[in-house]
Every structure is written in C-alpha cells, then in structure tokens.
Curated annotation (Swiss-Prot):
Cited InterPro entries: DapD_Trfase_Hexpep_rpt_fam (IPR005664), Hexapep (IPR001451), Hexapep_transf_CS (IPR018357), THP_succinylTrfase_dom1 (IPR023180), THP_succinylTrfase_N_sf (IPR037133), Trimer_LpxA-like_sf (IPR011004)
Protein name: 2,3,4,5-tetrahydropyridine-2,6-dicarboxylate N-succinyltransferase
Subcellular location(s) of the protein: Cytoplasm
Record HAMAP family: DapD (MF_00811)
Gene: dapD
Amino acid sequence: MQQLQNIIETAFERRAEITPANADTVTREAVNQVIALLDSGALRVAEKIDGQWVTHQWLKKAVLLSFRINDNQVIEGAESRYFDKVPMKFADYDEARFQKEGFRVVPPAAVRQGAFIARNTVLMPSYVNIGAYVDEGTMVDTWATVGSCAQIGKNVHLSGGVGIGGVLEPLQANPTIIEDNCFIGARSEVVEGVIVEEGSVISMGVYIGQSTRIYDRETGDIHYGRVPAGSVVVSGNLPSKDGKYSLYCAVIVKKVDAKTRGKVGINELLRTID
C-alpha cells in the first residue's frame, strides 16, 4: 500500500502537467486501483481511529488525479446518454451482483464509480459522488446528495433534498462526516468538513458549514464545525453585540441518548423543543 501511496503523491505534485493523452501507465494503473478499492469499501478517505477521524489525504489526491487522467466518454443511461470522465458504479451490474451486495437502488438514482454502498442501504432517486462511503442500513432519500468523499455512518437517514458537501469543488481539507444513527431533516445542508456526531437529529432546513455558529442553549457554548453527539438541532438566530441585528445560527435545543431515541420517535424529539 505504501508503494501505491508514493506513486499517487508523486503524480499529484505534477498534476497540472497530466492529461489523458500523456498520463503514464504506472500512474494510471495506481489511480484506477485506488478508485476500485474505494468502490469496494476496502479503502475509505476518512476513518475513525482511536476515537478520532483521520483523513487519508493521498486517497483524496487519487480521486482528484482520476479527473486528470480520464477523458470524457459517453455513458449510457435508461433515460438519456451522458458525457463524463467517471463511469457509473452500476454500469456492469446484473441481478446477481445486486443481490450479492444487498442494497436497493430506485431509478433514477446515480452513483459514481469509486463510491462505496454498504448492505441494506436504500438509495431513492438521489446522487452519490466519487469517493463517498455510505454505511449499512442507511436511507438516502429522494433528491438527497452525498458529496465527493463524504462519510455516512450506519443507520443514517438523509431526508429528501439533503445536501452533504464534498471535498473536490470547492477543494476542502477534510470530508463532511455524518456518524452512525443520525437523522438529517429535509433540505438541510451539512458542508465544509463538518462532523455530525453519533445519534444527532438535525431538523428540516438547517444549514451548517465551518463558520456556522452552533449554539447550545442549555450551556451557552458555541461550537464550530462539529455537532456534539446526541444533539437535537434546529435553525435559529443569535443577536449581534449591539443588538441591532441578528445572524443565522444552528441551535442545539436538547441532548438525547440512545435509550431516549429508542423510545421516542424523531418527530416527537423535534416537536417538543420548548
């Protein structure tokens, strides 16, 4: 694996010079191998090690290099034809392959090659970009988007129209991460490498980036870039120091543990926020 990483790191330093016409065989094979390993889930751009999320930057670099070495090609689809550098994940799947991998894909859901989809996942008409990792038992609901290299945990529900930001455009240092057992409400956006920790509930229409203030009304603490585990979050505003205006923020209205989540439905958690 170290040899593979070295090839990627070296090629990335001269990425501006690389084109589909001049990409050397060693680089091309290394990039394709990494994309295949990401596609199978054998590698992932970020993983939790000793309780901390670690981003493997060289894997992200391999994804970026794939756009340099590959030319656009015609991609056949049920409703239309497409023209892109990245093939679709399911282009060569037959019924036996779908049965073996054990997830559902509702048309016209689109998943790019290099994204991993785990067992018991349901993809409604949605979009999952290259390098993303979607773990077991997750629902990606209608018109939800999982951005490049985003990490989605087990038993997550991404509601209709949710946007989970990617790392490629604009270029971000770390992927957006939604940990296990989270619920992200309809039309919410979580971007710029924000981490939503395990068991959190994000209400409908909440927007969280690195600069968004995440205000805990019980403690008065303000978080940036991280929603603490077990948080129930709604959209809100905080007043300016002079009291003349207010600016958007996300508000943690309560904390819940796994036991409470097991007894109380998501809708009930969001309705009883006073």
